[in-house]
Amino acid sequence: MPKGNKKPNEKKEELEKFAKELQGSDSDEDAVVIEQPTVEPKLPQNDSSSSNKIVLSQAEKDLLRTELDKTEEEISTLKQVLSARQKHAAELKRKLGLTPFSELSQDINRSLKTVTDTDAYQKTAEVAAATSDTVKEKWNDMRNSSLFKSFESKLGSALNNAKMAASTSIDHLAGAARGPSQTGTPVAEEAKPIS
C-alpha cells in the first residue's frame, strides 16, 4: 500500500508503535516521548438556531447553576472579608493618628523626595544656581556703575522734589480750609530730603 493512501487509523497505529519502540529501546535521559493528543468532545449544537446557542442537558445545567451559586457565594464572602480588612486598617490608622491629610502630605513628601533625587533635577538645580549667581554678579556690577549711580541720584532728587511739592500743596490747602478767622498764616516747613 502506498504511503499516501493510508487510512487515519493505520497512521495512528504506526505512530503508537513507533513511540513504543522509542520508549523501549532508548535509554537516554533526553529521549522524546510522543504522547497522543487528547481530543475534547464537542458539545452538540443546535443548527436550527441562528445564534449558535449551546444545547445543554438538564444535568449539565444543574451542575453549572451549582457552580455559579458557589462562585457568587465566594465573591460575597471575599467582599465581606475585604470590608472587614478595610475597617481594621482604618482603625489601625486612627490609633496611629494617621489622617487622610497626613497620608496625603506623606505621599507628597515621598514624591518630592523622589523627584529631587533624580539626576535631571540635580542638574537643573545646579544650572539654576549658576544662573542665579551670574545674575547677582551682573546686578552688582550694574549698581556699581557710574551710569546707574547717576540715574539713582537723579531719580532720588526728583522724588524728593515731588514730596516737597505735595507737602507744600497740602499745607496750603490746610491753611485755606482753616479760613480767614485764624490769625497768622501757616508757615511752610522746609522739607528735609529723605536719604
Swiss-Prot record:
Coiled-coil region: 48-97
Polar residues bias: start-end ranges: 45-54
InterPro entries in UniProt: TPD52
Q: A Pfam family matched by this chain, by name?
A: TPD52
Give the record's GO CC terms: cytoplasm
Q: Which UniProt keywords apply?
A: Coiled coil
Q: Which intervals carry biased composition (Basic and acidic residues)?
A: 7-20
Q: Where is this region: Disordered?
A: 1-54, 173-195
The record's comment on protein family reads:
Belongs to the TPD52 family.
Q: What is the protein name stated in its UniProt record?
A: Uncharacterized protein F13E6.1
